[in-house]
A protein has these predicted regions:
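Beta-rich carbohydrate-recognition and catalytic domains
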Residues: 1-73, 77-127, 135-173
Length: 173
């Protein structure tokens, strides 16, 4: 087995073990809620296809091409008997996107859907999105409220931290 294939085998094996790992209840608990040993989503949970170019000609060393800092602050909902979380996925550039992961029990075996959520670019000045919250409404739609961030035009020159936050809304069936 060559170096590329060996690395691909290791990456795939580790990823499959991670997403199929059974979570362990931490005992004794407090009688009100249960804690578990492993986080349900981490920066290692997004699909390898999102992070790696699997073409040996363009990525002969199988290096990660899209780095992920964290997966966190998810909105969650039970839908059609499964647990869905719409998580914030933050890249190494500190910009975020939303992606949906699904679990049969809400405790482990979360698997991301094939593609991240695609939000329409209605406001080109927006630079980041985060903090999605979901609810299923009696009208049959699932609504999501999230925070949308834009650079503060009144910030001093060179200030990369000042921002203006606004609320966004999405809906889907």
């Amino acid at each position: 087995m060559n170096r590329y294939d060996n690395r691909l085998h290791i990456l795939t094996k580790e990823y499959d073990e991670l997403i199929s790992r059974e979570n362990e209840k931490i005992l004794p608990g407090n009688g009100v809620f249960e804690r578990y040993k492993y986080p349900i989503l981490t920066a290692d949970h997004p699909p390898l296809e999102w992070r790696y170019d699997f073409n040996p000609e363009t990525n002969p060393y199988l290096m990660e091409r899209f780095g992920i800092n964290a997966v966190f602050n998810a909105g969650a909902i039970k839908f059609n008997g499964k647990y869905l979380v719409m998580a914030r996925v933050e890249g190494h550039d500190r910009k975020s996107f939303f992606a949906i992961a699904e679990s049969p029990n809400g405790i482990d075996n979360f698997r991301f859907w094939e593609y991240p959520v695609q939000l329409p670019d209605l406001y080109p000045e927006e630079t980041n999105v985060y903090d999605m919250r979901l609810t299923k409404h009696e009208d049959g739609w699932i609504y999501g409220i999230f925070c949308s961030e834009s650079k503060d035009p009144d910030a001093p020159a060179g200030d990369l931290t000042s921002a203006i936050a606004a609320a966004g809304i999405i809906r889907s069936r």
